[in-house]
């Protein structure tokens, strides 16, 4: 028998089907749908493939991020997925838009076996109004999510039982061997990183909000640096938490929802996100209390990458039409585990390009007794390395052009550690300190402060910020041992230089190269 197609179901209908068909799906105490993605609890970057076609061959930065797949192999991957989908009893179809700016939006169709995936994408994308759905017609882009079916490693270019393949020519994505929902939303982001530069628009892995005076702030950052938390501000309207485009008119959100890390979610300090996890939301790989059905946001027994997905409408004050003006402030978020970065610095144009393409953050090891792992840097180009299609310096120059054109201020904000290394017991920057800095950026007072230059790094550090302890502002003053500070600073500078020289130096402008940090020893703290 052919599959039964369930097209564009409502939230209650999708929840009902999930509870009926998915043995491990259940409702939380507050009505969110708790689901499991099983074996894969995160993206599979080594299994992502870009189809090598004539129209994109010269634009793609081929390598370990964008791995080639031939058109013939893609046809076989797609056939495997469609043949599997044809055997399923139930298929769920979601027709939605990607992009709040109607001039650039894509009509996206998702075909999947799991109601959870349909509900997820119904939140992640923009749900058409009834009249828009009536004239939706053929989609611009189709996602075939056959994640319950394993990929075939005998197909040339496929190296495991997982394959996430994107074809820009046929406007299709095929998913095999992974049920992690994030593959779908990041597929859309990758498509926009290819499409938007054709129109001279900058695609951004970033969150954004807007103040009452129309002042827009964009937050760049890799996963875990605070994009979602910091953009959900009770005094400002949320534009979006993850994927945006900067056009000739301003900023628009690609998505219709948010996908937040759930581990450690605190209802007191992250109330907006906590309150959003209710009926209509998806709680992915979260553990529930057996007796109450409440989510245990500190339980990592399934995975550390627990997630919650919810529509923008769940955030009080979020823009229903997520389009705003040009950014007044751009903030680069870094989770520095070495304790060398200041909590905030104002960047020059050259520094903005450098820090954007280098995309620095750090992986933080556990600090339990007996742990021998050390902190290590992560350099994710443009704070979204896994999703870039073109070379990072291309996007860096795009950003520099736009910030100069619109006089945007660029800031580096460290949400990581101060006074020492994370792997040696240093404490993370308190959220209240980070929020105080952001408040000072938004009210304009931080721009009026007196600044000093951080030796070697060249960063401009304020000498005072309201409600921020003075000893935190200059990193070396928070340390107790000058030798340890010098050794750590030298180690990090060398890793910056090595990463830049290996990945960007050949294509970087002289202006960008001038911002590469150098080591300067300090004699006292």
Model regions and ranges:
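Charged, amphipathic alpha-helical linker segments immediately N-terminal to NTP-binding catalytic cores
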Residues: 138-141, 145-195
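Generic C-terminus detector
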Residues: 472, 477-525
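Hydrophobic positions on the alpha1 helix immediately C-terminal to the Walker A/P-loop
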Residues: 230
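Gly-rich Lys/Arg/Thr-decorated short loops/hinges at beta-loop-alpha junctions or inter-strand turns
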Residues: 57-62, 167-172, 376-382
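Glycine-rich, often acidic-flanked micro-motifs
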Residues: 1-31, 197, 205-207, 211-222, ...
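N-terminal accessory targeting/assembly segments
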Residues: 1-135
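Conserved lysine of the Walker
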Residues: 227
């Amino acid at each position: 028998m052919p599959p039964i197609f369930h097209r564009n179901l409502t939230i209650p209908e999708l929840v009902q089907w999930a509870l009926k068909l998915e043995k491990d799906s259940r409702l939380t105490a507050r009505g969110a749908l708790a689901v499991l993605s099983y074996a894969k609890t995160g993206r599979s970057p080594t299994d992502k493939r870009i189809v090598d076609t004539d129209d994109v061959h010269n634009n793609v930065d081929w390598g370990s991020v964008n791995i080639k797949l031939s058109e013939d192999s893609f046809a076989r991957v797609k056939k495997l997925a469609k043949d599997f989908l044809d055997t399923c009893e139930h298929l769920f179809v979601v027709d939605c838009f990607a992009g709040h700016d109607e001039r650039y939006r894509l009509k996206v169709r998702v075909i999947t076996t799991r109601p959870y995936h349909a509900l997820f994408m119904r939140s992640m994308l923009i749900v058409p109004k009834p009249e828009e759905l009536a004239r939706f017609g053929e989609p611009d882009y189709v996602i075939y999510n056959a994640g319950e079916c394993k990929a075939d490693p005998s197909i040339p270019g496929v190296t495991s039982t997982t394959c996430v393949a994107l074809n820009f020519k046929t406007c299709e994505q095929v998913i095999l061997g992974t049920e992690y929902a994030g593959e779908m939303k990041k597929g859309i982001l990758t498509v926009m990183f290819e499409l938007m530069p054709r129109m001279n628009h900058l695609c951004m892995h970033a969150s954004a909000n807007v103040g009452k005076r129309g002042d827009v702030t964009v937050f760049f950052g890799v996963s875990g640096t605070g994009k979602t938390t910091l953009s959900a501000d009770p005094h400002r309207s949320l534009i979006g938490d993850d994927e945006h485009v900067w056009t000739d008119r301003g900023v628009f959100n690609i998505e219709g929802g948010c996908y937040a890390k759930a581990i450690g979610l605190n209802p007191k300090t992250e109330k907006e996100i906590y309150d959003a996890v209710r009926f209509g939301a998806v709680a992915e790989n979260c553990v529930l209390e057996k007796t109450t059905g409440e989510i245990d946001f500190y339980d990592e027994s399934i995975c550390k990458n627990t997630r919650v997905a919810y529509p923008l409408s769940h955030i009080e004050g979020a823009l229903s039409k997520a389009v705003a003006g040009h950014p007044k402030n751009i903030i680069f978020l870094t989770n520095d585990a070495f304790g060398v970065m200041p909590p905030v610095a104002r960047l020059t144009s050259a520094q903005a390009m450098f820090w954007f393409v280098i995309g620095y953050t750090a992986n933080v090891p556990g600090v339990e007794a007996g742990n021998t792992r050390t902190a290590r840097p992560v350099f994710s180009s443009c704070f979204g390395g896994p999703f870039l299609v073109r070379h990072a310096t291309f996007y860096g120059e795009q950003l520099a052009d736009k910030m100069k054109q619109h006089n945007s201020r660029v800031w580096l904000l460290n949400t990581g550690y101060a006074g020492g290394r994370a792997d040696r017991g240093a404490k993370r920057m308190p959220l209240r300190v980070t929020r105080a800095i952001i408040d000072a950026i938004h009210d304009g007072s931080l721009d009026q402060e007196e600044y000093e230059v951080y030796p070697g790094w060249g960063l401009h550090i304020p000498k005072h910020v309201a409600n921020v302890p003075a000893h935190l502002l200059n990193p070396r003053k928070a340390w107790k041992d000058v030798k340890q500070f010098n050794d750590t600073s030298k180690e990090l500078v060398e890793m910056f230089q090595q990463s830049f020289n290996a990945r960007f130096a050949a294509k970087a402008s002289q202006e960008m190269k001038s911002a590469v940090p150098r080591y300067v020893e300090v004699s006292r703290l």
